[in-house]
């Protein structure tokens, strides 16, 4: 995955995957990090993420069934300090409070995946200002079946 390549993991990182769905993106990175925390609001998707982790023999992942905004704010208040945060929000982009919570968590890297270039640009700009994470790399991937024509990925790093 392009997102894993752009994240440039060194090994042992704490990765938070917001809007994780069935865990596909985070689980592809789990073998490169120390711990994965996935957050998704859809209960069936969270159960699928847990099943996918088990099926793949991944033991360093946990998944929370929660709204991304509420979870991000709570994780920031708890003092969680992830090395990398991955977001793959809906087309409307991230809620501003999600980006503020990410800034409070002070990650070294933010990997933003989107099918909407306008919200990707808007949110990466806000992340750059709030968290001091200027965009470093970007790329795009091929089409997904019966989905948008391409996925874009932007990495912001301190």
Model-predicted segments: where are they?
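Rossmann-like S-adenosyl-L-methionine
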Residues: 1-158
